[in-house]
Amino acid sequence: MARRPVLARHRIDFRNRVNYIGRFAPSPSGPLHAGSLVAALASWLDARAHHGLWRLRIEDVDTPRTVPGAAGVIMDQLRALHLHWDGEIMWQSRRGAAYQQAFDALAARGLIYGCGCTRREIADSALRGTADVDGERPYPGTCREGLPASRQARAWRVRVPPGVETFVDRWLGPQQQDVAAAVGDFALRRADGLWAYQLAVVVDDADQGVTDVVRGADLLGSTARQRVLGRLLGLAPPRVMHVPLIVDPATGLKLSKQNGAPALDCSQPLRMLQQAWSGLGFAPLAAATPEAFLQAAAAQWAQRFGMRHAAVPASPKAD
């Protein structure tokens, strides 16, 4: 008898589920910039090319990094760019109960343990010669068999099973990662009570019924561990596509809020959309309005990545 999925609480009516649900999930640590627009445009086009839904999720789970008012600015930018989302917005800061339920389900199976290690201790561990993944050292498993005497938990980690995780990225092709070796047991909750991004995104994608994740290539390193975590929770993984990053030609660094990327000038939406389209490797489109551009771009995207020669419907506007 097949094991029942742990998270059998989704509020989606799967009898009426569309074949494609995508999402854009910005963090409200500042306004959108040219790099984030590339990811937003790619995910929007992929949803429209598949006649699917495009959800908006505000990833404000890391509350200390949240900038007051930034979420509203992001929504205004998307509207100005004519990238209208479908349905209600999901806010991670309001979903603690959902994350707790997933955490408790894993803990009940002995898959969670407390860890008292500091970042410095992990960096100075026996694995210090191992390559970083997403800027972090792999966790060496110091507390896997129990906290050392006089130590208190600074984080709670999930026990990663052995094995190589393989998947096909729709842009980059076949990928694989030995999560246990490259990442180790990763944190799901911090000592201050904040939930980790990896747990939040897996639970949120499941609750929103997401079938396809289209995002920047800087998040490719998170995919394997998210698939592992989803499988431990009894969830089917979404398809993934990681699109190119936009690099500052002066510094060679990717455009990001941390690197001081300027906010989008949404007073010129067509120019911003054309630049993002170029960043995805497409030739310029002859279009006089943002609506005409998006219609033509979605048709080209469908030819390359979606249902060939399908009519592309106009996007419904968000409320």
From Swiss-Prot:
Cofactor binding remark: Binds 1 zinc ion per subunit.
Cofactor(s) it depends on: Zn(2+)
Pfam families, per the entry: tRNA-synt_1c
One Gene Ontology CC term in the entry: cytosol
Motif ('KMSKS' region): 254-258
Keyword vocabulary terms for this entry: Aminoacyl-tRNA synthetase, ATP-binding, Ligase, Metal-binding, Nucleotide-binding, Zinc
InterPro entries with a match to the protein in the record: Glu-Q_tRNA(Asp)_Synthase, Glu/Gln-tRNA-synth, Glu/Gln-tRNA-synth_Ib_cat-dom, GluQ/Sye, Rossmann-like_a/b/a_fold
GO terms, molecular function: ATP binding; glutamate-tRNA ligase activity; zinc ion binding
GO biological process: glutamyl-tRNA aminoacylation; tRNA modification
EC class: ligase
Function: Catalyzes the tRNA-independent activation of glutamate in presence of ATP and the subsequent transfer of glutamate onto a tRNA(Asp). Glutamate is transferred on the 2-amino-5-(4,5-dihydroxy-2-cyclopenten-1-yl) moiety of the queuosine in the wobble position of the QUC anticodon.
PANTHER family the record matches: GLUTAMATE--TRNA LIGASE, GLUTAMYL-Q TRNA(ASP) SYNTHETASE
Protein known as: Glutamyl-Q tRNA(Asp) synthetase
Source species of the chain: Bordetella parapertussis (strain 12822 / ATCC BAA-587 / NCTC 13253)
Upper lineage: Bacteria, Pseudomonadati, Pseudomonadota, Betaproteobacteria, Burkholderiales
